[in-house]
């Protein structure tokens, strides 16, 4: 059951609203050296094209921090500076970026946090309190270990620090590398604060592993109404982080956009290379943002029944196939004409739906 979203305080990262009634945003992180502006800009461009709303960049040294001024000028996405250990890099970064992420486990003393807060106040930019189970402050780690309780106590302590400094433009993340600790931590903290949540499973692994962990943890939280922005962390291509994140948003009921793909798992009746064809169809129609149910079936035997609830379906037969629109066969074509005709029909249907929504 899809629950209503928890209403949180709204903050802004550049022009992107986080929390309140704002759509749930997606983000990723570049892996280039931030001071290499050309490479970093290219990666940000890729993320923009993939549909990302925000981007985070590592600030590992003073050179990275100083490069942010020029990077900000060319970035098509709001920039978040990721700071570990060296609070002075945050002071430099705050002059140029749209938000600062700090790890309370390694940023340092209250005085250092105050300096970061003062810099963010001056530029009117928000902070993310980025709690990680693997790098909790010593006192919380010794008392609780890398547990949900330890993460929550760290978040509450640091939220209170910022509040005492009269600073409330912040969001919170509670990241662990497994599903259960991630879910439990966010559930535990949600009723205790009004601030927006950044969701994520940290160090989640490769595309396969991360997709499963993230779908279970983030998808479950999203269905409970928890979460305002998110990152799917993948050891792999940048674009996959956004692709998987947006799929999780769609299938958790939080994003009404794009195609819901339906395809049979294959059996002895298939009369085409369905694996290749399904991949080809999905890639060719990936640009469509209109909500549609599209079915790709490996034989005509089951297609008429199984695809009847799809907006559009393609069924491959022996050197021929069917195109089915809203349960009715509209084309029976030779194999050579089937694919391109199907693409045209789906694109036309998307245009029809968009027009009807505007009218």
UniProtKB/Swiss-Prot annotation:
User: What are the BP-aspect GO terms?
Assistant: isopentenyl diphosphate biosynthetic process, methylerythritol 4-phosphate pathway; terpenoid biosynthetic process
Q: How is the cofactor bound?
A: Binds 1 [4Fe-4S] cluster.
| Enzyme class, first EC level, given as a word | oxidoreductase
Mind listing the UniProt keywords for this protein, alphabetically? 4Fe-4S, Iron, Iron-sulfur, Isoprene biosynthesis, Metal-binding, Oxidoreductase
Q: Gene3D superfamilies from the xrefs?
A: Dihydropteroate synthase-like (3.20.20.20), Sulfite Reductase Hemoprotein, domain 1 (3.30.413.10)
Annotated metabolic or biological route of this protein? Isoprenoid biosynthesis; isopentenyl diphosphate biosynthesis via DXP pathway; isopentenyl diphosphate from 1-deoxy-D-xylulose 5-phosphate: step 5/6
Q: Which reaction does it catalyse?
A: (2E)-4-hydroxy-3-methylbut-2-enyl diphosphate + oxidized [flavodoxin] + H2O + 2 H(+) = 2-C-methyl-D-erythritol 2,4-cyclic diphosphate + reduced [flavodoxin]
* Enzyme Commission number, as recorded: 1.17.7.3
- Residues recorded as binding [4Fe-4S] cluster, renumbered to this chain, are 264, 267, 299, 306
Q: Which NCBIfam families match?
A: ispG_gcpE, PRK00366.1
Which family is this sequence assigned to?
Answer: Belongs to the IspG family.
Please give the function described in this protein's UniProt entry.
Answer: Converts 2C-methyl-D-erythritol 2,4-cyclodiphosphate (ME-2,4cPP) into 1-hydroxy-2-methyl-2-(E)-butenyl 4-diphosphate.
Name of this chain's protein: 4-hydroxy-3-methylbut-2-en-1-yl diphosphate synthase (flavodoxin)
Per the record, the gene is: ispG
